[in-house]
């Protein structure tokens, strides 16, 4: 079986990202794979390249052939040099720096109003409901008194 290490395309139109996979050379580009050994995101700045070096070395050792694109990625990560016996093979992949934490500008006013006004309104509604209950209880008491007076008469 002819085995190749190649890219499997994922993502939307004009926003591709790839998985580095080991697959039979006769399968479709995005078809069934034997193993996924890494990923490649070309649209990020800098491009994100991650390869499981142990698995890449294994598959290269058993005779799988990388495609041209994957060969370039393996050279960048240093895996191809390691496979060829270069003891000084080093990864030249640039690592993206950490993003800075977001800090709100205190000079600008917030777009949304604070929720402090809403609890006061809620308390007013609760007080109105309690007052309505007291009135209902008082009216019920008046009706009961009238009914009792009507029975006595």
From Swiss-Prot:
GO BP of this protein: translation
Family annotation (SUPFAM superfamilies): Ribosomal protein S16 (SSF54565)
GO MF annotation list: structural constituent of ribosome
Pfam family, one: Ribosomal_S16
Keywords linked to the UniProt accession: Ribonucleoprotein, Ribosomal protein
NCBIfam families tied to this protein: PRK14520.1 (NF011093), S16 (TIGR00002)
PANTHER family from the UniProt entry: 30S RIBOSOMAL PROTEIN S16, SMALL RIBOSOMAL SUBUNIT PROTEIN BS16M
Family recorded in the similarity comment: Belongs to the bacterial ribosomal protein bS16 family.
Name the record gives this protein: Small ribosomal subunit protein bS16
Native organism: Leifsonia xyli subsp. xyli (strain CTCB07)
Gene that specifies this protein: rpsP
């Amino acid at each position: 079986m002819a085995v190749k290490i190649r890219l499997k395309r994922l993502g939307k139109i004009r926003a591709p990202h790839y998985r580095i996979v080991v697959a039979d050379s006769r399968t479709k580009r995005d078809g069934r794979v034997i193993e996924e050994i890494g990923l490649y995101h070309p649209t990020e700045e800098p491009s994100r390249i991650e390869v499981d070096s142990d698995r890449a070395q294994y598959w290269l050792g058993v005779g799988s052939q990388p495609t041209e694109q994957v060969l370039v990625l393996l050279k960048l990560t240093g895996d191809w040099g390691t496979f060829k016996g270069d003891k000084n093979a080093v990864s030249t992949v640039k690592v993206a720096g950490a993003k800075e934490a977001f800090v709100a500008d205190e000079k600008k006013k917030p777009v949304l109003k604070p929720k402090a006004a809403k609890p006061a309104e809620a308390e007013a509604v609760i007080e109105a409901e309690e007052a309505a209950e007291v009135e209902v209880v008082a009216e019920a008491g008046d009706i009961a008194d009238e009914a009792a007076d009507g029975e006595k008469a």
